[in-house]
Regions:
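Bacterial N-terminal signal peptides
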Residues: 15-24
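Sec/Tat signal peptide C-region and signal peptidase I cleavage site
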Residues: 25-31
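Extracytoplasmic "Venus flytrap"
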Residues: 34-54, 74, 160-164
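Short beta-strand->loop
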Residues: 39-44, 130-131, 150-164, 191-192, ...
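Short, polar/charged alpha-helical segment
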Residues: 47-64, 168-173
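Pocket-lining segment of extracytoplasmic ligand-binding domains
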Residues: 94-96, 104-105, 116-118, 132-135, ...
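A conserved helix-loop-strand patch within extracytoplasmic ligand-binding domains
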Residues: 112-161
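An extracytoplasmic/periplasmic, membrane-proximal ligand-sensing/linker region
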Residues: 175, 196, 203-204, 208, ...
Length: 335
């Protein structure tokens, strides 16, 4: 029956066309690729490894994509680079983002273009480490004792232009021992890069150092092999003052995290977070966030220090609001 055959042929043709269209749409969706620039820091550090992990995660979800790590002066520089659209995404510390959005030095005006994608780590605490003999001889039990005793202490902070230096100064100020106070008591506050801080401690040119480092960092282990060390906590009141100023988080270094420390140490921590611009393509932000959620193991594996990272922690940044597209992904994941 020719009429029935014609209908059958037309139905087959229509079905084939629909199948081809469906396959085409599916392939088009799967073929989404990204070529993104990530602003990081100097080459060779943990942020470089995180850049590689982010690249691997995005590649896994969107084959053919590339996230190129661009070296920079660090998080403070990245606030400006992201604001100026010199990169698509950037790693920035929470305190650096706070400086940007609040217009604190070195920024001359507030930067209101930032949006959070994900929190990457929260375990780089401000460690107040000193010579065990100095701490014992002066009866120090906390950072605040320096102010109470008006000690002529020699403290070394991170170099100028580094946000950790600003947080260290904020801790001293909140404890009642500002750099000016310490100088008036006959002491000194100097500024040096992390490796130089260790040298000053080894050479007995500094009594205390304050720096943001991972617990049990190799530089601290090396210093402990040359100098008997002890650690000082801050009080909850000091912690809250600095948290209010910098929107950072408190942190407890556990007893026996070091074999030379036997008590819990309250301090503060700076956190690294991944940012985009508020006006970034929502689909890009959603896809990158989803790639991180789906492939968190690619970030965990870049360094043993990243093992604690999970999706819940990614969703818990507080300093700058999340991009709505990133927030949507975390909400769908239950956070």
């Amino acid at each position: 029956m020719p009429g029935r055959n014609i209908v059958k042929k037309n139905w087959i043709a229509a079905a084939a066309a629909a199948l081809i269209l469906t396959i085409g749409v599916s392939q088009q969706a799967h073929a989404q690729t990204y070529n993104l620039t990530l602003c990081g820091a100097s080459p060779g550090g943990l942020w470089t490894l995180l850049g590689a992990g982010i690249d691997a995660a995005v590649k896994k979800s969107f084959p053919g994509s590339t996230v190129t790590y661009q070296t920079s002066g660090g998080g403070l520089a990245n606030v400006g680079l992201l604001n100026d659209k010199k990169c698509d995404i950037a790693i920035i510390h929470d305190a650096e983002a706070k400086a940007g959005v609040a217009g604190l030095p070195p920024f001359k005006a507030p930067v209101d273009s930032l949006a959070t994608i994900a929190q990457l780590y929260t375990w780089a605490p401000m460690q107040i480490i000193g010579s065990k003999s100095y701490i014992a001889e002066n009866g120090l039990t906390s950072l605040e004792d320096i102010a109470a005793k008006k000690l002529p202490v020699r403290i070394v902070l991170n170099r100028r232009g580094n946000i950790v230096r600003a947080v260290g100064e904020a801790m001293l100020n909140a404890a009642g021992a500002s750099p000016k106070d310490i100088e008036s008591w006959g002491g000194s506050v100097t500024y040096a890069a992390s490796n130089e801080q260790g040298d000053q401690m080894r050479d007995r040119r500094a009594d205390l150092m304050i720096n943001s480092l991972f617990v049990n960092h190799s530089s601290i282990r090396e210093l402990a092999s040359a100098v008997d060390l002890a650690m000082l906590p801050i009080t909850p009141e000091t912690a809250q003052k600095v948290i209010g100023e910098w929107d950072i988080q408190d942190f407890t270094i556990k007893a026996n995290d070091y074999d030379w420390n036997d008590k819990d140490i309250l301090t503060l921590t700076v956190s690294a977070q991944l940012f985009a611009r508020k006006d970034a393509d929502p689909k890009m932000v959603k896809d990158v966030t989803q790639a991180l959620v789906d492939n968190v193991a690619d970030l965990q594996s870049v360094h043993k220090a990243m093992a604690p990272l999970d999706v819940k922690l990614m969703s818990q940044a507080k300093t700058v609001p999340y991009h709505p597209a990133a927030k949507e992904v975390f909400a769908a994941a239950g956070f």
